Amino acid sequence: MMIFFQTNPTTIFVFLISLILSSHYSEVDAETEFSYIEGSGTGPEDWGQFGPLCGNGTMQSPIDIQHVQVSPTLGELQRHYKPAPAVLVNSGHDIAVEWRQDAGKITINGTDYQLRECHWHSPSEHTFNGTRYDLEIHVVHQSSSGKFAVVGIVYKFGRPDPFLARLYNQIRNIGSGEERNLGIINPEDIMFDSKEYYRYKGSLTTPPCSENVTWTILKKVKTVSTIQVKALREALDEGNESNARPTQDTNGRLVQLYCPRRNGGST
Protein backbone atom coordinates (compact mmCIF):
# COMPACT_ATOMS: atom_id res chain seq x y z
CA MET A 1 0.00 0.00 0.00
CA MET A 2 1.46 3.36 -1.05
CA ILE A 3 0.75 6.64 0.73
CA PHE A 4 1.20 9.87 -1.19
CA PHE A 5 1.96 13.22 0.46
CA GLN A 6 1.19 16.55 -1.08
CA THR A 7 4.35 18.55 -1.67
CA ASN A 8 5.21 22.08 -2.78
CA PRO A 9 8.47 23.80 -3.81
CA THR A 10 9.10 25.09 -0.27
CA THR A 11 8.77 21.62 1.24
CA ILE A 12 11.13 20.15 -1.36
CA PHE A 13 13.69 22.91 -0.75
CA VAL A 14 13.67 22.40 3.03
CA PHE A 15 13.97 18.63 2.56
CA LEU A 16 16.99 18.99 0.25
CA ILE A 17 18.72 21.40 2.62
CA SER A 18 18.20 19.00 5.53
CA LEU A 19 19.71 16.18 3.46
CA ILE A 20 22.77 18.28 2.62
CA LEU A 21 23.31 19.29 6.26
CA SER A 22 22.82 15.72 7.45
CA SER A 23 25.36 14.48 4.92
CA HIS A 24 27.85 17.19 5.90
CA TYR A 25 27.75 16.46 9.62
CA SER A 26 27.94 12.71 9.00
CA GLU A 27 31.14 13.20 7.03
CA VAL A 28 32.64 15.42 9.73
CA ASP A 29 31.86 12.84 12.41
CA ALA A 30 33.33 10.02 10.33
CA GLU A 31 36.51 11.96 9.69
CA THR A 32 37.07 12.99 13.32
CA GLU A 33 40.23 11.22 14.50
CA PHE A 34 42.23 11.11 17.67
CA SER A 35 45.22 13.41 18.05
CA TYR A 36 48.09 14.05 20.45
CA ILE A 37 47.12 17.68 21.04
CA GLU A 38 46.30 18.35 24.69
CA GLY A 39 43.15 20.38 25.24
CA SER A 40 41.92 19.82 21.68
CA GLY A 41 39.08 17.50 22.67
CA THR A 42 40.72 14.67 20.73
CA GLY A 43 44.00 14.39 22.68
CA PRO A 44 45.06 11.47 24.91
CA GLU A 45 42.98 12.68 27.87
CA ASP A 46 39.86 12.41 25.67
CA TRP A 47 40.58 9.14 23.85
CA GLY A 48 37.79 7.42 25.77
CA GLN A 49 35.39 8.71 23.10
CA PHE A 50 37.24 6.65 20.48
CA GLY A 51 37.49 3.50 22.60
CA PRO A 52 36.16 3.06 26.16
CA LEU A 53 39.26 1.13 27.27
CA CYS A 54 41.37 4.22 26.56
CA GLY A 55 39.59 5.87 29.46
CA ASN A 56 38.74 3.08 31.87
CA GLY A 57 41.03 0.16 31.00
CA THR A 58 43.16 -1.47 33.70
CA MET A 59 45.92 -2.95 31.51
CA GLN A 60 46.85 0.06 29.42
CA SER A 61 50.11 0.86 27.64
CA PRO A 62 52.67 2.38 27.59
CA ILE A 63 54.05 2.09 31.12
CA ASP A 64 57.06 3.27 33.10
CA ILE A 65 59.21 0.17 33.59
CA GLN A 66 60.56 0.14 37.15
CA HIS A 67 60.48 -2.99 39.30
CA VAL A 68 60.87 -6.20 37.30
CA GLN A 69 61.07 -9.91 37.94
CA VAL A 70 64.05 -11.61 36.32
CA SER A 71 62.70 -14.60 34.39
CA PRO A 72 65.41 -16.62 32.58
CA THR A 73 62.83 -19.24 31.61
CA LEU A 74 61.18 -16.85 29.13
CA GLY A 75 63.81 -17.79 26.56
CA GLU A 76 65.13 -15.83 23.61
CA LEU A 77 62.66 -14.08 21.32
CA GLN A 78 61.82 -16.49 18.50
CA ARG A 79 61.80 -14.54 15.23
CA HIS A 80 61.12 -16.15 11.86
CA TYR A 81 61.10 -13.24 9.41
CA LYS A 82 61.52 -13.15 5.64
CA PRO A 83 61.71 -10.36 3.03
CA ALA A 84 58.36 -9.31 1.54
CA PRO A 85 56.77 -6.43 -0.41
CA ALA A 86 55.99 -3.41 1.75
CA VAL A 87 54.62 0.11 1.55
CA LEU A 88 55.30 3.27 3.55
CA VAL A 89 52.10 4.76 5.00
CA ASN A 90 51.55 8.20 6.54
CA SER A 91 48.39 8.13 8.67
CA GLY A 92 48.93 11.69 9.89
CA HIS A 93 49.63 10.48 13.42
CA ASP A 94 52.47 8.07 12.64
CA ILE A 95 54.70 6.75 9.85
CA ALA A 96 54.45 3.01 9.24
CA VAL A 97 55.93 0.28 7.08
CA GLU A 98 53.21 -2.22 6.22
CA TRP A 99 54.06 -5.61 4.76
CA ARG A 100 51.51 -6.61 2.11
CA GLN A 101 52.54 -10.27 1.89
CA ASP A 102 53.81 -12.90 4.33
CA ALA A 103 56.86 -11.41 6.07
CA GLY A 104 57.17 -14.09 8.71
CA LYS A 105 56.28 -14.28 12.37
CA ILE A 106 57.38 -14.45 15.98
CA THR A 107 56.40 -17.23 18.35
CA ILE A 108 55.53 -16.63 22.01
CA ASN A 109 54.47 -19.44 24.34
CA GLY A 110 53.68 -21.64 21.37
CA THR A 111 51.49 -19.06 19.62
CA ASP A 112 52.46 -17.71 16.20
CA TYR A 113 52.00 -13.99 15.55
CA GLN A 114 52.29 -12.86 11.92
CA LEU A 115 54.20 -9.65 11.20
CA ARG A 116 51.89 -6.85 10.07
CA GLU A 117 53.71 -3.53 10.30
CA CYS A 118 56.08 -1.30 12.20
CA HIS A 119 55.71 2.36 13.11
CA TRP A 120 57.49 5.03 15.13
CA HIS A 121 56.71 7.26 18.12
CA SER A 122 58.75 10.29 19.12
CA PRO A 123 59.62 10.65 21.93
CA SER A 124 59.51 7.07 23.22
CA GLU A 125 56.24 5.90 24.73
CA HIS A 126 57.69 3.49 27.28
CA THR A 127 59.90 5.02 29.95
CA PHE A 128 62.46 3.42 32.24
CA ASN A 129 62.51 4.63 35.84
CA GLY A 130 61.12 7.88 34.50
CA THR A 131 63.64 8.23 31.67
CA ARG A 132 62.07 8.87 28.27
CA TYR A 133 64.16 8.29 25.15
CA ASP A 134 64.04 10.08 21.80
CA LEU A 135 62.30 7.49 19.63
CA GLU A 136 60.52 4.14 19.83
CA ILE A 137 59.64 1.67 17.09
CA HIS A 138 56.74 -0.75 17.49
CA VAL A 139 56.90 -3.93 15.42
CA VAL A 140 53.34 -5.22 15.35
CA HIS A 141 52.33 -8.88 14.98
CA GLN A 142 48.90 -10.51 15.13
CA SER A 143 47.75 -14.06 15.88
CA SER A 144 45.01 -15.97 14.07
CA SER A 145 42.73 -15.22 17.04
CA GLY A 146 43.26 -11.46 16.69
CA LYS A 147 45.61 -10.94 19.62
CA PHE A 148 48.72 -8.78 19.25
CA ALA A 149 52.39 -9.16 20.07
CA VAL A 150 54.37 -5.94 19.79
CA VAL A 151 58.14 -5.65 19.97
CA GLY A 152 59.36 -2.23 21.07
CA ILE A 153 62.85 -0.79 20.64
CA VAL A 154 63.89 2.59 22.06
CA TYR A 155 66.51 4.95 20.65
CA LYS A 156 68.62 7.85 21.87
CA PHE A 157 70.24 10.50 19.71
CA GLY A 158 73.54 9.42 18.21
CA ARG A 159 74.59 7.64 15.04
CA PRO A 160 71.95 7.21 12.30
CA ASP A 161 69.74 4.13 12.39
CA PRO A 162 70.46 2.00 9.26
CA PHE A 163 66.83 0.95 8.76
CA LEU A 164 65.56 4.54 8.85
CA ALA A 165 68.46 5.58 6.62
CA ARG A 166 67.05 3.36 3.87
CA LEU A 167 63.61 4.97 4.22
CA TYR A 168 64.76 8.54 4.80
CA ASN A 169 64.03 10.05 1.37
CA GLN A 170 60.58 8.45 1.17
CA ILE A 171 59.70 9.69 4.68
CA ARG A 172 60.72 13.23 3.77
CA ASN A 173 58.48 13.25 0.70
CA ILE A 174 55.34 11.44 1.84
CA GLY A 175 52.27 13.50 2.64
CA SER A 176 49.56 12.82 5.19
CA GLY A 177 47.19 10.12 3.97
CA GLU A 178 49.62 8.90 1.31
CA GLU A 179 51.43 5.61 0.82
CA ARG A 180 54.54 4.76 -1.18
CA ASN A 181 55.73 1.45 -2.55
CA LEU A 182 59.00 0.34 -0.93
CA GLY A 183 59.61 -2.86 -2.85
CA ILE A 184 60.99 -5.79 -0.88
CA ILE A 185 61.79 -5.03 2.77
CA ASN A 186 63.52 -7.49 5.09
CA PRO A 187 62.19 -7.11 8.66
CA GLU A 188 65.56 -8.25 10.00
CA ASP A 189 66.95 -4.91 8.75
CA ILE A 190 65.34 -3.36 11.83
CA MET A 191 68.19 -5.11 13.68
CA PHE A 192 66.90 -6.79 16.81
CA ASP A 193 70.36 -6.94 18.35
CA SER A 194 69.43 -7.47 22.00
CA LYS A 195 68.77 -10.80 23.68
CA GLU A 196 67.57 -9.17 26.90
CA TYR A 197 64.02 -7.87 26.98
CA TYR A 198 61.10 -6.84 29.19
CA ARG A 199 57.75 -8.62 28.90
CA TYR A 200 54.32 -7.60 30.18
CA LYS A 201 50.63 -7.71 29.26
CA GLY A 202 49.13 -4.48 28.03
CA SER A 203 47.23 -2.68 25.31
CA LEU A 204 47.51 -0.89 22.02
CA THR A 205 48.84 2.63 22.66
CA THR A 206 46.33 4.24 20.30
CA PRO A 207 42.53 3.97 20.12
CA PRO A 208 40.74 1.63 20.60
CA CYS A 209 43.45 0.75 23.21
CA SER A 210 42.51 -2.95 23.10
CA GLU A 211 43.92 -4.90 26.06
CA ASN A 212 45.07 -7.94 24.10
CA VAL A 213 48.75 -7.19 23.60
CA THR A 214 51.83 -9.09 24.72
CA TRP A 215 54.59 -6.51 24.93
CA THR A 216 58.27 -7.27 24.42
CA ILE A 217 60.55 -4.26 24.98
CA LEU A 218 64.20 -4.83 24.09
CA LYS A 219 66.51 -3.72 26.88
CA LYS A 220 69.27 -2.37 24.65
CA VAL A 221 68.94 1.29 23.69
CA LYS A 222 69.87 1.92 20.05
CA THR A 223 70.81 5.19 18.36
CA VAL A 224 69.10 7.41 15.81
CA SER A 225 70.16 10.73 14.30
CA THR A 226 68.38 14.01 14.99
CA ILE A 227 67.61 14.50 11.28
CA GLN A 228 65.97 11.07 11.09
CA VAL A 229 63.64 11.89 13.98
CA LYS A 230 63.01 15.33 12.49
CA ALA A 231 61.88 13.72 9.23
CA LEU A 232 59.47 11.41 11.07
CA ARG A 233 58.00 14.34 13.00
CA GLU A 234 57.69 16.79 10.11
CA ALA A 235 55.78 14.27 7.98
CA LEU A 236 52.89 14.12 10.47
CA ASP A 237 49.83 16.33 10.80
CA GLU A 238 50.29 19.60 12.65
CA GLY A 239 50.14 19.01 16.39
CA ASN A 240 51.00 15.32 16.12
CA GLU A 241 54.75 15.79 15.80
CA SER A 242 55.12 14.53 19.37
CA ASN A 243 53.11 11.32 19.11
CA ALA A 244 53.75 9.55 22.42
CA ARG A 245 50.86 8.61 24.68
CA PRO A 246 51.50 9.40 28.38
CA THR A 247 52.47 6.41 30.51
CA GLN A 248 49.62 4.51 32.17
CA ASP A 249 49.20 2.99 35.63
CA THR A 250 50.57 -0.55 35.88
CA ASN A 251 47.84 -1.51 38.38
CA GLY A 252 50.11 -4.13 39.90
CA ARG A 253 50.96 -5.88 36.63
CA LEU A 254 53.98 -8.15 36.52
CA VAL A 255 56.87 -6.95 34.36
CA GLN A 256 59.39 -9.66 33.57
CA LEU A 257 62.99 -9.27 32.44
CA TYR A 258 64.67 -11.96 30.38
CA CYS A 259 68.42 -12.18 30.98
CA PRO A 260 70.08 -15.31 29.51
CA ARG A 261 72.72 -15.73 32.22
CA ARG A 262 70.97 -14.48 35.37
CA ASN A 263 69.05 -16.37 38.02
CA GLY A 264 65.46 -15.48 38.79
CA GLY A 265 64.51 -12.77 41.28
CA SER A 266 63.25 -9.21 41.53
CA THR A 267 65.10 -5.98 40.78
What are these regions (language model features)?
Residues M2-T267:
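Alpha-carbonic anhydrase
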